[in-house]
Design a protein with these regions (language model features):
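Predominantly extracellular beta-rich ligand-binding scaffolds that present long acidic/polar faces
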Residues: 1-167
Length: 167
């Protein structure tokens, strides 16, 4: 799969799960393969009540397949990204990606907008580039966050939380 040179300029104001400026959700990715999302730009503001929200991608899910490789190359977000959710599953918000399952590489990504995750009933996690990532072998190179990042729980200028960070 490849998604390249896409631009969103429209605001997104509704949505309850997996909301992204370019891609909301891609899942059921079993077996070997690579997903490349490159040179994509979001200029729209996203203000929703969803639980996986990102300026470029809401949720990319390979269901724990170690043979899945996800690449985010030179993706830029200029919009303000926020979710105010009552979801019991948690709220994950990122300038580029809200929630990422699998081995991911982030290269040359930038976030310029504010990123905010708030929840009344569960964890809220925010990252300037990625809110939550499962795989501890993922990498970030030449990524910069210029925006304010806020959340109730885990907050990171680049990454809010790594789920499986152990040896």
């Amino acid at each position: 799969w490849k998604i390249t040179n896409c631009v969103n300029t429209g605001d997104i104001k509704n949505g309850v799960s997996a909301i992204g400026g370019i891609l909301g959700y891609m899942g059921n990715l079993d077996g070997p393969g690579t997903v490349i999302i490159s040179d994509c730009i979001n200029k729209g503001n996203i203000a929703v009540s969803g639980n996986d929200v990102g300026g470029i991608v809401g949720n990319l899910n390979s269901h724990g397949s170690s043979s899945q490789h996800h690449k985010y190359i030179n993706c830029y977000n200029y919009g303000n990204i926020s979710s105010n959710s009552g979801s019991t599953d948690g709220v994950f918000v990122g300038g580029i990606v809200g929630k990422e399952y699998g081995f991911a590489e982030f290269n040359g990504c930038r976030n310029y907008g504010t990123v905010n995750a708030s929840s009344t009933s569960a964890n809220s996690i925010s990252g300037g580039i990625c809110g939550w990532i499962e795989d501890d072998t993922s990498s970030f190179a030449d990524c910069i966050n210029y925006g304010k990042v806020t959340a109730k729980n885990n907050i990171g200028g680049i990454l809010g939380e790594v789920s499986k960070a152990y040896n």
